[in-house]
């Protein structure tokens, strides 16, 4: 039996930039309204395809882990939003807790969970904006291929996008095939 999967069209750079602007506007609205830190979750999805069953399942794991983190720490969640978009899934939480501690826990989750490297958990503070990893003494994200700083490899296009996509897909497939 053959199962045909529709081929998804890639997302244009203009669409990605517009989605990023809309996300920043939502974040700013929440920061103004709640005056509390906001957690923004997106996925690391190299290539043109940003919405697939693989990525949706990965986002599902990320959502579960983030909700568990908030629950375990008994942090008050003032609002939560989840969007399934052609440009990739996005989630926001507004949390009544100090931003630096939230970021420290989010960075640990990104570093310790087998899929965490594919999650981009940003923490934005109403007073000081984005809380960076470096401000907490955390290391920069590493490249999925060569372990150099990810930003440098991404900007220089050091690795073929097909190689990076294959690595991401393998990480996801390995996670869901475990046990």
Please annotate each region the language model reported.
Residues 79-87:
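Short, charge-patterned binding micro-sites
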Residues 1-69, 73-75, 84, 101-179:
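Long, contiguous binding/interaction regions
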Residues 89-97:
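Short cationic amphipathic helices and targeting signals
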